[in-house]
Amino acid sequence: MIRDIQNIDDDIVRKKRVIGEMLYNDPDIIEVLDNPELDPNCPEEYYYQNIYPFIRIPGTQDTSRNYITFMLDDMEPSQFNKAMKSQFLKVVIFVHKDLVKTKWGAERHDLLAYLVRDVFHLSNSLGLQLNLKSNREGVTDTDYCTRTLQFEMVTPNSMQPYKTNKYERDSIVNNHDRRVNRESV
């Protein structure tokens, strides 16, 4: 591979790493996720067990679990300023029906939503301020209730005047026969 995959210059990849770290480094979130199989003193273990950097809908399983899943989307550039774009962080919390009740007097999906909102709403941790746009309750099936939070931020748009695709940039096109020389790739 000729691309430097270890140093990806992509704001979504970078921000998703930060979002995941912010979630699993919050001890209250780890406690409320309530996974007795994992050590709360090693919160990074919760990543890809209870916290996912993509929307993962739980399937049929033997053990009841709770999940925080998230995705980050680029939306259209600002119509007034092409150097800026809107990004949306969507957090979907799934709580198994057997784990909804908590010792804190709030339903687990509502409590997790409160904690997530507390971490991200009006936070500048991803560069520019995140603003909560919606907080909705729902269900997936007979086993899981959900809470979906959507945050918006306006952030700089990529304004790179050159291509970063090394396969395309390093290729040589011979105009006579339109063959692509990829020997340097």
Question: What are the residue ranges of the model-derived segments?
Answer:
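Small/polar-rich, solvent-exposed N-terminal microdomains that initiate assembly or binding
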Residues: 1-79, 175-185
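Short, charged interaction patches at domain edges and termini
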Residues: 1-21, 77-84, 126-185
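Functionally constrained cores in energy, signaling, and assembly domains
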Residues: 14-16, 27, 49, 74, ...
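Acidic, Ser/Thr- and Gly-enriched intrinsically disordered low-complexity segments
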Residues: 29-45, 56-71, 78-81, 86-129
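Intrinsically disordered, low-complexity segments enriched in small/polar residues
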Residues: 44-46, 50-52, 65, 92, ...
